Swiss-Prot record:
GO terms for molecular function: 3'-5' exonuclease activity; DNA binding; DNA-directed DNA polymerase activity. This is DNA polymerase III PolC-type. Residues 426-582 form the Exonuclease domain. Required for replicative DNA synthesis. This DNA polymerase also exhibits 3' to 5' exonuclease activity. The gene is polC. GO terms for biological process: DNA-templated DNA replication. InterPro entries: DNA_pol3_alpha_NTPase_dom, DNA_pol3_finger, DNA_PolC-like_N_II, DNA_PolC-type_N_I, DnaE2/DnaE/PolC, DNAPol_HHH, DnaQ, Exonuclease_RNaseT/DNA_pol3. It comes from Staphylococcus epidermidis (strain ATCC 12228 / FDA PCI 1200). It comes from the Bacteria. Belongs to the DNA polymerase type-C family. PolC subfamily. It catalyses: DNA(n) + a 2'-deoxyribonucleoside 5'-triphosphate = DNA(n+1) + diphosphate. Its EC number is 2.7.7.7. It holds the Pfam family HHH_6. GO terms for cellular component: cytoplasm.
Length: 1442
């Protein structure tokens, strides 16, 4: 007979993983697909053999962790053996090499021979493992010694290895023969082995005693002192060596106990040349463990030992013989007077900055800097953490941002003149130059064509001699060589001739600002002054009139306009192509009503002009609190209103909100730096007047400009610095030296390189990244020594400190909660509470009701929480009025005021009876009843009416704290389909500008970072050890990658403030089409400052609504203690089916909270019969270490029953108060236990004084997390209501379940008879390990369908005439599925079928395809389903159709 257990093998594996406490350490697919297939128990030998099936091999570390955890968990019960089977063995060759050393350890070879064997080379050939040995003696010995044991060891690990063959390696020598023979002679020295085992056991006992103790030594020192002259860089370690000494800093540490009782420490250490794993075992009779415990991440060590190839990780590691902790002097700022950094990027600079702001602040404080600025790219999301870090370290925080400044509109026409475009003469021209700077580079070719009436009428082409050699870059770009320029005329001659040739024609150029820059500079040097001719820029013109184009380069436009372009970047060819393109553009302008040069800018410029402007970097520094709010407005506008590929700040916007903000010139991508490269000094000084300070940065930060030949040489760079300094003097604004830091130390640069390399489109990939570490004062002074000591000190120290002193103390986040105002909220909450209480309990309220209301109202009103309650009440009332129940989450059900204001259905008073007629009540406040719903039915002793049963006995303290001053966190579960309505209703309540979605920040996760690191190393052709890869991964992890929104969180701004008092705003992930804007700050940062409503979506209220619509039954009238409903939690009998028929021992398939395999197993173990026991199970199933290894064992051992174990957090406080503990001590104990903090001596003493049993104390100590009882009660109440429909109105239930909760259907199986469906479910159980996620979802649906079929109901095929788009409908004792249930058929098509059939019947499959857009695959599926009876492939043409 085959017995199908209620739990699947997969669920058993999950239970096992939870029990041995490694669920969070296994890979997700292992956890989801692992299967415990069998446990063989031998009582005679006290041996348990676990048969475990996995989807793929575990890493060797995870394998050891897993097996060790199982052995430790059951060591007191039995000796454990584990046999693995692996589904996917395609890569077993790779893993066999990693497991080889472990499998050797399972044999009975001597330790020395094992060590020798581990060094051998391996070759996998099919299912045969070949081990290459040195000679025949070795081969014969190993073959005899292993005797199949190595094969067995591999097979236990899941390998399909049939044979291990030892073959002589012809490349090896026989040098080790004598040594080998000696090892063989030692093989049978059993006594020595036994002695060793004895010592190991003694050591294990000692280690167990010390395991949880703190280290008793201050500094790690094991073995001999290490000579510093022997230290070698880690990067130089490339092969096995006998003795090596290194030093480095620990970045990861793992200390674990072995089965023998010894410990092993594994350190990952780096000296920033490379990284290495160091290992060491505790020695016999030594205090090594204490020394190991003295080590921690961040400490420097010096270590010495043997470098060997680790056969498990296939990497070089050091087996340490000596280790000592050393003091390493950190980087210091030794300058007497410190600088202030005004340009710094944190991990909030998206995929660019590395450390979080706290690391910078801590470093600056250690260096003695008085202040520090943060200026992330385009965002201010580091501000909250910056404030906290600055307060902690006592440093002045300066808040700022590096933004993208754009002119409101980029002109298309310069120096417009009153000229008719049709009649005007144009000079279309192009220059080729020695570089991009018109101030420092020279024209080498000037070419132009003259255009009139749409025709080219003349040409001009001249080379000019630059008197310098061309760079390779320019030669390759322009195809102009030095030889071509040797005899060319001087530029003065060329420009003089050109000016005369041009006359008064309108200049036309592609990117005219560049070409005109060289012309104007040349004219001025000749004394002509800048050109007075009008100009048209075809680049900006195209961007304006060809908005549908994504590109506007000359190559692209030539193709679009059908113009031939040859030898791009030769002036004459570019000029001719531009001319023909421009001629066609003139016609386009005419069609747009532009006929005059004066009209171009006026008529073609639009509100999106900011998109065409080229952004320049700008630094914005907050000077005071007003400036902070203005910065928040600027940031918000740039992210919401002016976002185009990147957030943009129009100059007009900056001018509008610049009060309280200091504006700096930023980096080499700033407007002023560009002007120094492109304009004369008078223009530079004019631009400088817009700014409040000028930034200059170390020469190393401009190195990429020199590499790209944008700056010619150091002399040119020095001239640029001097011009910037002169501009500051002329504008009377300070010049400050800034570091543009992106990481802390020089060795962190690699992490930034990796992040930038992971972004293919990032322009920074085009050049070498500059040295952008956080510089000390001395470093910065040294960087600017070429300016002279006095000037360097002025810009590095004097000016930065003076500027910092001008900045007031600014606080970016509030220090208290600001809730919305609602007039009369206090009175309304009080009146609502008492009004509804009197409706329920009568005018003469019981004292227990009055006491509870007053206690709560004192806290709620006294702490200003009334408005929070009232908002929640309005939201719930709106949903109820619209016909949707609301489920509460969290602890709000602990509040009786919340119950009386109808925020929650959970009544937290002690269990009690109430008479709805005469209001007689009876309370049970002695702890004898777990839930009022469990009280026996009873007639009112006063009037004889049936009494109502209520009360869950939940203390108010679990909601607002013992003092009642904790900000209430009211989470509400709205119907998933109603949730958007609830969200939008907040706009009605408070106004659209007062509610925002709670923002989140997504950072680079460890697995993502690993991919970035591997990709970078592969692209660079670099091989690194695993330890170094781990270090690089840590460096990239945590950097901001994107933004998002909380699934249900709504932030409410009070009417007397605006959002910019708290945070900027943006769209989630910068998606400009999103329906809601979010807070710019992560909502956790402002959680204590503004009200956050948790308006969540849930299936239960949606299902309840559908059941109500189908049945007409008000769900609030459903009896919670219905006996037949309660019976399904312990068996399926009340459903009219047997366990064998539905393959389950309970009837809870599809019941929320109780339908999973894990909880069904709990139900089987506990057989609950009451509501309070169901609440217990809900609490037990959601807690951590509450059920497994705790309550489960207590129940199995008969120590207590389900009703008395600790299930929910509130149970602890209530139980302890009933036991006699002071309420404050009971509350404190509950808080400690629910947070996994165990019990203090004071708590233990109080509990023992009041005779709390020892098992209760032990249970408290094991708990890591607990579920609130109010939350559990709310969930169970919904579950019982749904279960009621399942028992008494089955077709309504199944229709609602399949419509609301199910998503993947196998309709072909579902329409079959019950036996066939059951057989399919059984078959899928047997193949569960092989099922994918989608198949498992189908199985869940089939379990419900099997139950439905055995209850006498069936599913019809899809009906073209009757099926709805989305809902299952009832017909007789059957359900008709909707179109959406067809695999591969989407929502739009489902709706289209319904709409199409209203126009008339489908005449054929071809007609179905045309009208509804069904694919052939879907039509074939419907055909197989029997949904298209007699429907021909094509319609027959009738004579009447002609």
């Amino acid at each position: 007979m085959v017995i199908i257990l209620a739990m699947t093998n997969r669920e058993k594996f999950k239970v096992l993983a939870d029990q041995i406490k490694i669920s969070n350490q296994l890979e997700q697919d292992i956890l989801e697909q692992g299967e415990l297939t069998r446990i063989d128990v031998s009582n005679k030998n006290r041996t348990w053999t676990f048969q475990i099936s996995l989807p793929h091999f575990l890493s060797h570390e995870d394998y050891l962790l897993f097996t060790h955890a199982i052995e430790e968990e059951f060591k007191e019960i039995a000796t454990v053996a584990i046999d693995f089977s692996i589904k996917d063995t395609n890569n077993q060759d790779e893993f066999a090499l990693k497991y080889f050393g472990h499998c050797i350890d399972q044999t009975r070879l001597s330790p020395k021979v094992k060590g020798q064997l581990k060094q051998k080379k391996l070759i996998m050939s099919g299912n045969v493992l070949k081990v290459l040995v040195s000679n025949d003696i070795e081969r014969n010995h190993f073959d005899k010694a292993c005797n199949g044991s190595l094969v067995k060891a591999f097979r236990q690990c899941g390998f399909e290895i049939d044979k291990v063959v030892f073959e002589t390696d012809s490349t090896n020598h026989d040098d080790d023969l004598a040594s080998l023979e000696a090892h063989i002679q030692q093989e049978d020295e059993q006594s020595a082995r036994e002695a060793t085992e004895k010592l190991e056991k003694m050591k294990a006992e000692k280690a167990k005693q010390q395991d949880n103790n703190e280290s008793t030594v201050e500094k790690c020192q094991i073995g001999k002192p290490i000579q510093i002259e022997n230290i070698k860089p880690i990067e130089s370690i490339i092969e096995e060596e006998f003795k090596v000494a290194i030093e480095g800093v620990i970045f990861d540490i793992n200390l674990k106990e072995l089965k023998s009782g010894r410990h092993i420490v594994e350190l990952k250490v780096t000296d920033y040349t490379d990284s290495l794993v160091l290992k060491m075992f505790t020695r016999k009779n030594k205090d090594d463990l204490d020394h190991f415990k003295a080590l921690s991440v961040g400490k420097w060590v010096r270590a010495q030992g043997r470098i060997e190839e680790d056969t498990f990780v296939r990497d070089l590691v050091m087996m340490m013989s000596d280790i000592e902790e050393i003091k390493k002097t950190p980087k210091q700022d030794k300058a007497e007077d410190k600088r202030v950094e005004f340009h710094l990027h944190t991990s909030m600079s998206q995929m660019d900055g590395i450390p979080n702001i706290s690391a910078y602040v801590e470093q600056a404080a250690k260096w003695g800097h008085q202040a520090l600025a943060v200026t992330d790219h385009n965002v201010v999301q580091a501000f909250p953490d910056a404030h906290n870090a600055a307060e902690k370290h006592g440093i002045k925080m300066i808040y700022g941002m590096e933004g993208m400044l754009v002119d409101d509109g980029v002109p298309i026409a310069y120096k417009p003149t009153d000229r008719n475009l049709k009649d005007a003469t144009y000079v279309v021209f192009d220059v080729e130059t020695t570089g991009l700077s018109n101030q420092y580079d020279k024209i080498i070719e000037l070419a132009a064509v003259k255009v009139h009436n749409g025709e080219i009428i003349d040409k001009f082409e001249r080379f000019s001699n630059p008197h310098e050699r061309l760079s390779e870059t320019i030669i390759n770009l322009t195809h102009i060589t030095d030889d071509m320029l040797t005899d060319a005329p001087e530029i003065e001659e060329v420009l003089t001739e050109f000016k005369e040739w041009v006359g008064d024609a309108i200049f036309v150029a592609h990117n005219a600002s560049f070409d005109m820059g060289f012309i104007d500079t040349g004219y001025e040097r000749l004394g002509f002054g800048p050109s007075t001719n009008g100009v048209i820029d075809t680049l900006e013109l195209s961007r304006t009139i060809n908005t549908e184009y994504g590109k506007h380069g000359l190559n692209f436009l030539a193709k679009k306009y059908g113009v031939e372009l040859t030898q791009h970047h030769r002036a004459i060819y570019d000029t001719e192509a531009t001319a023909y393109i421009f001629i066609k553009m003139v016609q386009q302008m005419k069609e747009l009503g532009v006929n005059n040069h004066l009209e171009i800018n006026k008529k073609l410029t639009n509100e999106d002009a900011y998109k065409r402007a080229r952004p320049s970097h700008v630094t914005l520094i907050v000077q005071n609190q007003e400036g902070l709010k203005n910065l928040f407005k600027i940031v918000s506008a740039s992210l919401v209103k002016y976002y185009y590929r990147t957030p943009r700040i129009p100059r007009s916007l900056l001018n509008e909100y610049r009060e309280g903000i200091l504006i700096g010139t930023a980096c080499d991508e700033g407007e002023l730096f560009t002007a120094v490269m492109q304009k004369d000094q008078s223009e530079v000084e004019k631009i400088a007047k817009f700014y409040d300070f000028i930034e200059v940065q170390p020469p190393a930060l401009y190195q990429d400009l020199m590499d790209r030949e944008l700056i010619r040489d150091n002399e040119t760079l020095t001239q640029i610095y001097k011009r910037l300094i002169d501009a500051g003097k002329s504008a009377n604004i300070p010049v400050i030296a800034t570091g543009n830091a992106h990481y802390l130390y020089e060795h962190d640069a690699i992490a930034r390189k990796i992040l930038i390399a992971s972004q293919p489109g990032n322009p920074l990939n085009r050049s070498t990244l500059p040295e952008a570490h956080f510089r000390t004062t001395d470093e910065m002074l040294d960087d600017f020594h070429f300016l002279g000591e006095e000037k360097a000190y002025e810009i590095v120290v004097t000016n930065t400190n003076e500027l910092a002193n001008k900045i007031e103390k600014v606080v970016p986040i509030k220090d208290k909660l600001f809730t919305p105002r609602m007039d009369g909220a206090n009175e309304e909450i009080r009146e609502l509470s008492y009004s509804n209480a009197k409706k329920l309990y009568g005018e003469d309220l019981p004292q227990i009701v009055i006491d509870r209301l007053e206690k709560e109202l004192d806290s709620i009103i006294g702490n200003g929480f009334s408005v929070i309650y009232l908002i929640s009440q309005r939201l719930v009332k709106k949903s109820l009025d619209d016909g949707y129940l609301v489920g509460s989450r969290g602890s709000v059900g602990s509040s009786f005021v919340a119950t009386m204001t109808e925020i929650t259905e959970v009544n937290p008073l002690p269990p009690h009876y109430i008479c709805s007629h005469c209001k007689t009540s009876e309370f049970f406040d002695d702890g004898s009843v777990g839930s009022g719903f469990d009280l026996p039915d009873k007639k009112c002793p006063t009037c004889g009416n049936e009494l109502i049963k209520e009360g869950q006995d939940i203390p108010f303290e679990t909601f607002l704290g013992f003092k009642g001053d904790k900000v209430p966190d009211i989470d509400l579960n709205f119907s998933g389909e109603y949730q958007p309505n609830a969200h939008n209703y907040t706009k009605v309540l408070f106004g659209e500008d007062k509610v925002f979605r709670a923002g989140t920040i997504g950072t680079v996760a460890e697995k993502t970072a690993f991919g970035f690191v591997k990709g970078y190393l592969n692209d660079q052709g670099i091989h690194k050890r695993g330890a170094e890869i781990d270090r690089l991964v840590k460096g990239c992890t945590g950097v901001k990658r994107t933004t998002g929104q909380h699934p249900g969180g709504i932030i409410v701004v009070p009417d007397y403030m605006d959002i910019y008092d708290f945070t900027p705003i943006q769209f989630p992930a910068d998606d400009q089409s999103a329906a809601w804007m979010t807070t710019h700050f992560d909502f956790h940062s402002i959680h204590d400052n503004v009200l956050k409503l948790d308006i969540l979506g849930h299936d239960d209220p949606t299902m309840i609504r559908m059941l109500q619509d189908l049945s007409g039954i008000d769900p609030k009238t459903i009896p919670v203690d219905d006996k037949e409903t309660m019976q399904i939690f312990s068996g399926p009998e009340s459903l009219g089916v047997t366990e064998d028929e539905i393959l389950c021992k309970t009837g809870t398939f599809g019941v929320p909270e109780f339908g999973t395999g894990f909880v069904r197993q709990m139900l089987e173990d506990t057989k609950p019969t009451t509501f309070s026991e169901l609440v217990q199970i809900s609490g037990l199933s959601h807690g951590t270490d509450v059920w497994l290894g705790n309550a489960q064992e207590l129940i199995r051992q008969g120590i207590c029953d389900l009703s008395s174990v600790i299930g929910c957090r509130d149970d602890i406080m209530v139980y302890l108060m009933y036991a006699g503990l002071e309420p404050s001590m009971a509350f404190k104990t509950m808080e400690f236990v629910r947070k996994g903090r165990g019990l203090t001596d004071e708590m233990v003493e109080a509990m023992k004084e009041n005779n709390v049993p020892d098992w209760y104390l032990d249970s408290c100590r094991k708990i890591k997390y607990m579920f609130p009882k109010a939350h559990a009660a709310a969930y169970v109440l919904m579950a019982v209501r749904i279960a009621y429909f399942k028992v008494h109105h089955p077709l309504y239930y199944y229709a609602a379940y399949f419509t609301i909760r199910a998503s993947d259907f196998d309709l072909i199986t579902m329409i079959k008879d019950k036996t066939s469906i059951r057989n399919t479910v059984k078959d899928m159980y047997s193949r569960y390990m092989d099922l994918g996620k989608k198949e498992k979802d189908v199985l869940t649906v089939l379990e419900i369908m099997n139950e439905m079929a055995h209850r006498g109901f069936r599913l019809q095929p899809i009906s073209l005439e009757k099926s709805q788009a989305f809902d299952f409908i009832i017909e007789g004792d059957t359900l008709i599925p909707p179109f959406i249930s067809v695999p591969g058929l989407g929502e739009n098509v489902a709706q289209r079928i319904v709409e199409a059939r209203e126009e008339g019947p489908f005449l054929s499959k071809e007609d179905l395809n045309k009208k509804a857009g069904l694919s052939q695959k879907v039509i074939d599926y419907l055909d197989e389903l029997g949904s298209l009876p007699d429907l021909p492939d094509k319609a027959q043409l009738s004579i009447f159709d002609m």
